[in-house]
Amino acid sequence: MLDKPATRPQMTRWQLAKFVLGRSFYLMVALLFIESALTAATTYLIIKAGRDVANDDFLTTDLIWILLAQGGAYAVGAVSWIFAERAGFGAFGRYMQRFARDNRHETKLLHEKGTREVVEPFLTGETFHIFFQLVYELEADLKLFFHLILNIAVIGSEIDTSFPVAYGIIFVVLIGLQMLARKPVARANLENQRMTNRMTAQGYTAWDNVFAGNRYNLRLWLAGFKVRLRDALRAQIKAIRTRETVSTVSGIFALIVIFIVMVKVSIQNAGDTEVLVMLATVLPRQIEMTKDCYTLAAGWNDMVAVWARLGGAVDNMYPDPDAAYDARIKYDRLVLREDEQAKTVGSLDDALKLVYGKRTGRINVRGGNGSGKSTMLAALKASIKNRAYYWPTTDRLAFQFALGTELVDDDEGIDPELLAEAGEPEQHEAVKKVGFSSGERQLKSLQEIVRFTDASIYLLDEWDANLDPKNRAAANALVEKLASRARVIEISHRDAA
């Protein structure tokens, strides 16, 4: 007996997030640390210059060293972006490879429109943006963390040890605040993602409803779109409000604490000109660091948002097929015709026995509309897996003959102002490429299947649907060629009575 469908094991968020790890990511982290170390060196040189001024020993070389250190930090930071991009693209590539590998045998999901509407946005861009948001947030947060830690160490050792203590208190309080706010922020961001995906999914039916020219259908489509648009806007505003409230409170708290410490140090060293001058020279850096604390808090909230969005990608990594999928097949309305014999089956097991009964030959699946012919072919593929080649009724499968024939506008969606700044015209002439009619695609696809595939079983769904009599005869000869070397189970109009 066939196993009953069970819930598939799910990937964790940590497993998905680890796709960004690799040589590029580690090099990015190393460069960020070097950049922060050079920035901390600049802080030290500024303090040293202030001390020299207080002691009437200031030299022009102090400025040169500051220039070299800070300039080096800028250069290293620029290089780190290259590896950040490589890490993001590598993560998305690994995600697509894993999705393809782990879902290639779930043929029962091919025609599940509801599941496809939910999962497809993650394949067409959502997960790509999630990975890059993750990489960018990690880059920004690590840069801030290294920057704060190293600069705090310099200021604490050169001016006053109260500053490291103050920043330590700030970190503890901010982490506690973020932990308290984590669930509300995550819930708001997850709802925002769901509503946004729901809104963008509506766009997949825009073309049909607009260009069909029917006022009735267009009115219904626009009404549905407006509802989803309003829901997405409300969810977006709620997510931003929740996130920014926590971040603002964190930033103000950090600013108050650091300025209290600065005032305290100034009072304690009122007669020490050297300390006061050094404190004054790092005042801009101190203000910058309080801003960094606020930004780091906001970055933590953004990381929570990315973590929530990772949950959406994880939830849709392994979609479950309908547990009652096989029940859609109306076996009492199906006839499996081989040669001159017509046979009936009562279950998918019976159909598999008939398929495995011979190594070659053709079985034509007959039945009325809604009897489950295509459903049975998909169920057979899900059971037979790699030994079967399945050709469904879709023209979206990748074939060699079609590579490079699609009319793709590389400038689609690009801001015209960006094209103008680059010195390129806003409208490009479409490159004329060879196109194929549905019948031509059908025949060429079948020719490629015969030539380049070597399965023991072929499942062909409506292979002659778009063919004229001449091309149907040519296609039938190709199917016969397949049947001479393998088992062919087909849905076709061949010899239809």
Please give the residue ranges for each predicted region.
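An intracellular "coupling" helix at the cytosolic face of ABC transporter transmembrane type-1 domains
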Residues: 18-23, 125-135, 214-259
